[in-house]
């Protein structure tokens, strides 16, 4: 994980307005949302796993599933996850469970990031600053 200092860190927005701005730029809502926090992800690369620019948000008014929820943006960071190419040896639950859970555990949750991608992450954060703060 590589943090990218930004002027958007600590800024608050209505979640709905933030979604309306970020989704057209290519950000998606990460599947690991909770009621009080979540992430917007921008997939930068998908060779040898996935490289994301991740924008964390924390609820400051209401829950993330409520209309009118307000969030505060945290420090953006880049994250690479490398997934197993073979059978997941930690899979549990039997055949019924496998109908719903078809994802393997990451082999490395915080894998090394090629320095060539750091400029891409920084430019994406700059784009967000320009859109959200101006």
UniProtKB/Swiss-Prot annotation:
Q: Which InterPro entries match?
A: Uncharacterised_YugN-like, YugN-like_sf
* Classification via SUPFAM superfamilies: YugN-like
Q: Which domain of life is it from?
A: Bacteria
Would you tell me the protein name for this molecule? Uncharacterized protein YugN
The organism encoding this protein is Bacillus subtilis (strain 168)
């Amino acid at each position: 994980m590589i943090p990218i200092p930004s002027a958007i860190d600590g800024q608050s927005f209505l979640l709905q307005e933030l979604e309306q701005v970020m989704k057209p730029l290519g950000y998606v809502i990460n599947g690991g949302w909770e009621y009080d926090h979540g992430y917007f992800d921008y997939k930068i690369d998908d060779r040898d796993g996935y490289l994301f620019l991740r924008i964390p948000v924390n609820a400051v008014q209401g829950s993330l599933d409520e209309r009118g929820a307000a969030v505060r943006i945290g420090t953006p960071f880049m994250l690479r996850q490398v997934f197993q190419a073979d059978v997941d040896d930690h899979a549990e639950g039997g055949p019924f469970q496998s109908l719903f859970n078809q994802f393997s555990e990451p082999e490395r949750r915080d894998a090394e990031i090629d320095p060539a991608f750091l400029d891409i992450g920084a430019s994406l954060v700059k784009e967000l600053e320009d859109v959200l703060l101006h």
